[in-house]
């Protein structure tokens, strides 16, 4: 039983950090890429671009505050043992764990995008597909796993939320003063699916041979493939009647709409050596319609006795009900997007060839908020090349976890790629048959973003004086005209 639990935790520690994301901190100070407009709409690339499906960009991210290999390994006699070794006390193990576990995942895929300049104005428009999930949970489960003794553990007050939606956007960026650039982006949202719930009771009874539990709570679901006309109050969820697969119904059910805005600004000081910026992104909501809304209560029991190593089958039984409210009585509801706040500052030297940046990034989820602080060194050695090396602090991110991003922006191609959490410290994981894989030790998060756009037009410098005259220059011109 203990070996099985060790295996499960090792898998969770790795799976929990693999993700794709929509807010990539390392690229924030990279001047050439069109991708960073997602982080601050005041930013503008040097050229216009066209981004095509799949190639345009994919960004995936998972964040958590408890799943890392380091939280489950301990140094003993010059080597490493797992948290389930007899030499590791429960107190020592639980000291590494937060009071509540927080887990989130975001994924964005650019379906189509276009950006172009009209004089001093930069415009961009396009279409994105988005998926976001977040959950907040009790850490009592790790007490049960470590102690492996008789006891009842309270996992209540657990909540989760998931959204899938499309957004069609149009944005602009303009330099309104010699040292100030502002930007805004408006998004029309179309909801694809929403699922959420919370457990007000989730109790687990653990002994060395079996895990039993009871659960109760509330849940809701909404989506273009849901039809609640056959739902009756107090009945079990009739999945075969609620879930529609005919394309005619699905296309006619695109009735979950919303609106969101990105707002940003950047100011330059000390003759453009210091740049300070701030932005709010995904400030908006989706209104989910009544016709495609179902919800109700969760009530059930379960037991788990482990995994059969020979057959790879999980030995578990469960008995639960998803009771629903009457479809005619359900109401539409509104869900908020995961809004983000970015505040950055960069000081550059050597004619903007090297910059030192600091970025505060906070995401507000439905069940929690998540903040990080990223320091970076940004290199711009050529007019068509930039690179960044970064380190993210807060949320117990350890030294030795770095980010890296690269951007090539020639007259025909705009290519970018990067990762925010690259763990340089690896350890040997538990033996699995004849294999003993290496695992990243400290990382709780890992993201990757990559994309290719096709550039067009002449290069623009968003920090040059082109198109914006200083007050002094304007006064000088008026004086000349008066003479």
Where are these regions (language model features)?
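Bacterial Sec-dependent N-terminal signal peptides
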Residues: 1-25, 345, 483
């Amino acid at each position: 039983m203990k070996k099985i639990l060790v295996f499960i935790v090792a898998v969770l520690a790795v799976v929990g950090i693999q993700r794709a994301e929509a807010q990539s901190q390392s690229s924030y100070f990279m001047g050439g890429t069109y991708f960073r407009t997602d982080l601050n709409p005041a930013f503008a690339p040097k050229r216009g671009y066209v981004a095509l499906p799949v190639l345009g960009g994919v960004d995936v991210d998972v964040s958590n505050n408890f799943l890392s290999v380091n939280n489950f390994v301990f140094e003993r006699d010059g080597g490493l043992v797992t948290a389930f070794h007899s030499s590791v006390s429960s107190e020592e193990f639980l000291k590494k764990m937060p009071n509540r576990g927080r887990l989130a995942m975001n994924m964005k895929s650019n379906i189509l995008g276009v950006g172009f300049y009209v004089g001093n104005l930069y415009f961009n428009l396009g279409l994105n597909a988005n998926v976001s999930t977040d959950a907040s949970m009790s850490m009592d489960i790790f007490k049960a796993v470590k102690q492996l003794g008789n006891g009842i553990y309270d996992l209540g007050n657990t909540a989760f939320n998931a959204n899938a939606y499309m957004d069609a956007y149009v944005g602009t960026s303009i330099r309104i003063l010699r040292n100030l650039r502002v930007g805004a982006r408006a998004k029309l949202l179309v909801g694809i699916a929403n699922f959420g719930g919370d457990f007000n009771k989730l109790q687990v009874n653990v002994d060395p041979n079996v895990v039993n539990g009871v659960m109760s709570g509330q849940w809701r679901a909404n989506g273009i493939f849901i039809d609640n006309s056959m739902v009756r109050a107090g009945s079990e969820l009739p999945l075969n009647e609620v879930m529609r697969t005919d394309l005619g119904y699905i296309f006619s059910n695109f009735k979950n709409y919303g609106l969101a805005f990105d707002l940003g600004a950047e100011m330059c000081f000390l003759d453009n050596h210091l740049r300070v910026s701030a932005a709010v992104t995904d400030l908006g909501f989706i209104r989910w319609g009544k016709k495609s809304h179902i919800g109700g209560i969760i009530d059930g029991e379960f037991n788990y006795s482990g995994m059969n190593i020979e057959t790879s089958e999980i030995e578990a039984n469960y008995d639960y009900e998803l009771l629903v409210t009457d479809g005619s009585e359900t109401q539409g509801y509104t869900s908020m997007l995961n809004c983000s706040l970015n505040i950055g500052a960069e000081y550059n030297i050597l004619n903007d060839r090297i910059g030192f940046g600091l970025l505060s990034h906070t995401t507000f989820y439905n069940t929690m908020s998540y903040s990080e602080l990223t320091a970076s060194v940004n290199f711009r050695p050529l007019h068509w090349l930039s690179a960044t090396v970064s380190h993210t602090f807060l949320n117990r991110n350890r030294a030795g976890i770095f980010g890296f991003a690269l951007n090539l922006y020639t007259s025909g191609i705009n290519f970018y790629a990067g990762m925010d959490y690259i763990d340089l410290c690896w350890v040997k994981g538990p033996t699995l048959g004849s294999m003993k894989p290496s695992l990243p030790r400290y990382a709780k998060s890992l993201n990757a973003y990559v994309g290719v756009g096709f550039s067009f037009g002449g290069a623009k410098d968003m920090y040059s004086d082109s198109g914006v005259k200083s007050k002094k220059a304007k006064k000088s011109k008026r004086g000349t005209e008066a003479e």
